[in-house]
């Protein structure tokens, strides 16, 4: 096999090899992806109901928009975290193009930068979650702080999975 397909298949990152480094994190990644998939299905159902209620029943439901936005944040942040574990998200192609010790240094830098971004996400979102928890979400009986919670969880998971990759080094 030659051409772009061969290069893509050869260069595709994988989470294989990480189980011996952090076996429990594989279960966390599977659970995270399962929750993201369930949230995506729920998001689709809420959007369908939003359209049916508005255009078929002529009685729009106020709760659908804030719930859809919350589900979207869950899908995006949890999906991004799993993508970090598989190194298919926040991937730095420059590291793969570099030679020898520069490749390892750039991959290490990329993983550290990703972990730092995850930590900042988690801390910043935690402060927003706490600061806005007592406020109510317009249109839905939910605390406004709940809308920032996916960034707390997703940011923490991004950091954990980036550190897992850092510990694994070039393996996987």
Describe every region a protein language model picked out:
Residues 1-172:
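Alpha-helical transmembrane segments and membrane-interface helix-loop junctions
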């Amino acid at each position: 096999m030659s051409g772009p397909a061969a290069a893509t298949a050869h260069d595709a990152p994988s989470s294989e090899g990480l189980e011996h480094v952090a076996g429990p994190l594989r279960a966390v990644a599977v659970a995270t992806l399962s929750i993201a998939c369930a949230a995506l299905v729920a998001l689709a159902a809420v959007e369908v109901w939003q359209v049916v209620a508005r255009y078929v029943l002529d009685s729009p439901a106020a709760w659908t928009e804030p719930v859809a936005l919350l589900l979207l944040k869950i899908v995006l942040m949890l999906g991004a975290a799993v993508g970090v574990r598989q190194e298919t998200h926040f991937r730095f192609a420059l590291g793969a193009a570099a030679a020898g010790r520069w490749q390892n240094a750039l991959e290490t830098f990329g993983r550290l930068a990703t972990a730092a971004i995850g930590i900042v996400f988690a801390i910043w979102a935690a402060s927003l979650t706490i600061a806005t928890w007592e406020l109510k979400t317009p249109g839905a009986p939910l605390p406004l702080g709940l809308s920032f919670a996916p960034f707390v969880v997703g940011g923490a998971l991004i950091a954990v999975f980036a550190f897992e990759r850092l510990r694994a080094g070039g393996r996987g």
